[in-house]
Amino acid sequence: MPRMALLDDIGCPDDVRKLTTKQAEDLAEEIRAFLIDKVSRTGGHLGPNLGVVELTIALHRVFDSPHDPIIFDTGHQSYVHKILTGRANGFEKLRQRGGLSGYPSRAESVHDWVENSHASASLSWAEGMAKGFLSQGEDRTVVAVIGDGALTGGMAWEALNSIADQQGLRLVIVVNDNGRSYTPTVGGLANQLAIIRTDPHYEEALDRMKRHVTDKPLGKQVFGLMHAAKAGVKDALIGNGIFSDLGIKYLGPVDGHDVLSVERALELAKRYGHPVIVHVMTTKGKGFAAAEANEEDHFHAVGRIDPVTGASLKASGGASWTQAFAGAMVELGERRPDIVGVTAAMLHPVGLAPFAARHPDRVLDVGIAEQHAVTSAAGMAAAGLHPVVALYSTFLNRAFDQLLMDAGLHHAGVTIVLDRAGITGTDGASHNGMWDMAMCGIVPGLMLSAPRDRQHLVSVLNEAVDIDDRPTVIRYSKDPIPDDIRIVTSHDGLDVLCDGPEDGILLVAHGQLCAEALAAVDQLDSPVRVVSPRWSLPVCGGLIEEAARARAVVSVEDGLVVSGLGSHLADALSQRGMWRPIRSLGIPQRYLDHDSRSAIMAELGLDSRGIADAVSQLVAQLDGEYS
């Protein structure tokens, strides 16, 4: 792309602070053009970052990063921050191996303090840092940028409740309101009241008045009425009561696309010396007509797109698991009036939108509140409904206690459907859905299935909604759904997919890796028996019988090896006094860097070549031991 007069000279936040206000405004336009050009080629979170350009510029002009930590909640709004901290050149390989992460990354820059990309955690991080700096006498301000739905998460409000009781913390909370959570309010009087309320002289005067008035008869009541009247006037003007009632000072609303206005608000907040909320109004997808016009999500996350029209350039990869689930839910909804859908701020991504269109009164979107989603679903089950909770696999982590103690302990007939299970790839460590089976495996009575194709998915979903005495979990991957796989025979909950010798190598696979396992067989010199359980947890009798007859077992899964399918099978055999050599192929117990799903799977030996190699190595080892 052509040289950008301002952006090309930005190497660090000091360069941003040297700009005039007019230059800062011009820089914002250059950054938008840069983002549209780069992200349209690589994919990524485009809409959220287009909405925070001026805000991020203002943050770096007012605060001294990294001395003053800037923490981005969920992290997907950090692209502009990366650009202003010297990483613009890395956008050529955004979310690719060796390139920039799509989220803050401590390995990339000292300006990135927190890299967890799950929502609603920034305020807890910020409070902890601010307390640490205060206790050590350090003159540093911590900034947390939260919004884009993250304030619907309970953890954020737990933090706000704690922060409200921590006066003296140099903590600025920027609420990035992109119009999807609050009603915008503007007005000169409201702005003046905000300035007055954060003026230290005003606070001193208020304290003096309180001491003077409350010494008199009825003084406390009079002061309370005066303070309530003042608060009521401001709340009526700008609707900040939800924050001020907590005891946290509030500034705003501020036009988030006016650099000077945002700077002035941030300067006031910085000078105040106590926790302050700065309410900034922004437009998601700002400056890209196609994004602003997209009512569904304003191009929240895109693949490769046309940088002018916004049209997707991604080649069709066939039907997705999400689409298959969506269709199955619509069919279930027509037959079963007790079926309800539950989601955590992801109605469209998880495939519940078609069901909601048919049955709007039978869908509950709880916001970014997975804990609440699972327990609310348990309550629905207790009342006679059968809820289907659809989440991304990685977000089930946040609701484990509710799964264990609310759904599990109460034998609740709740079905949890986990999209994006296994390796997701480009979004990095925090978004891989590799933890779910290990967690689910310790919930007594829970049943889990990893369907291998559409017919298997539809079948187990129909079975799951008929189970009313325990939670059920269905997990599937981000990849396109494979063609239906032929079943040779079935017995005791186990499907035989390739009929090799029963006393030879038993290759056990589930989910998306069944197709890879069958492809691996074609690369082997000797026959192998391939089986797949209809329900992976608990281990079915058919799998135990097959493993007991086999010479050795190789298990293949796109979840953690620890507490995975192979380890559960080994434990089931051990409980029966049996033992067989078992080689478990899966994801190691470590965090994985961002890359394409296919590249990571190949690196871990979970593609057909890697599976074939593992089988060959096991056979060679056995032949060597017993020759």
From Swiss-Prot:
Residues the entry annotates as binding thiamine diphosphate: H76, S117, H118, A119, G149, A150, N178, F288, E370
Sites where the protein binds Mg(2+): D148, N178
Coiled coil residues, start to end: none
Cofactor comment text: Binds 1 Mg(2+) ion per subunit. Binds 1 thiamine pyrophosphate per subunit.
GO MF terms held by the record: 1-deoxy-D-xylulose-5-phosphate synthase activity; magnesium ion binding; thiamine pyrophosphate binding
Cofactor(s) needed for function: Mg(2+); thiamine diphosphate
Entry's Gene Ontology cellular component terms: cytosol
Pfam families the record matches: DXP_synthase_N, Transket_pyr, Transketolase_C
EC number, as in UniProt: 2.2.1.7
Biological process (GO), any one: thiamine biosynthetic process
Family indicated by similarity: Belongs to the transketolase family. DXPS subfamily.
Free-text function comment from the UniProt entry: Catalyzes the acyloin condensation reaction between C atoms 2 and 3 of pyruvate and glyceraldehyde 3-phosphate to yield 1-deoxy-D-xylulose-5-phosphate (DXP).
Subunit-level organization: Homodimer.
Entry-linked PANTHER family: 1-D-DEOXYXYLULOSE 5-PHOSPHATE SYNTHASE-RELATED (PTHR43322), 1-DEOXY-D-XYLULOSE-5-PHOSPHATE SYNTHASE, CHLOROPLASTIC (PTHR43322:SF5)
Name of the featured protein: 1-deoxy-D-xylulose-5-phosphate synthase
Species of provenance: Cutibacterium acnes (strain DSM 16379 / KPA171202) (Propionibacterium acnes)
Gene (name only): dxs
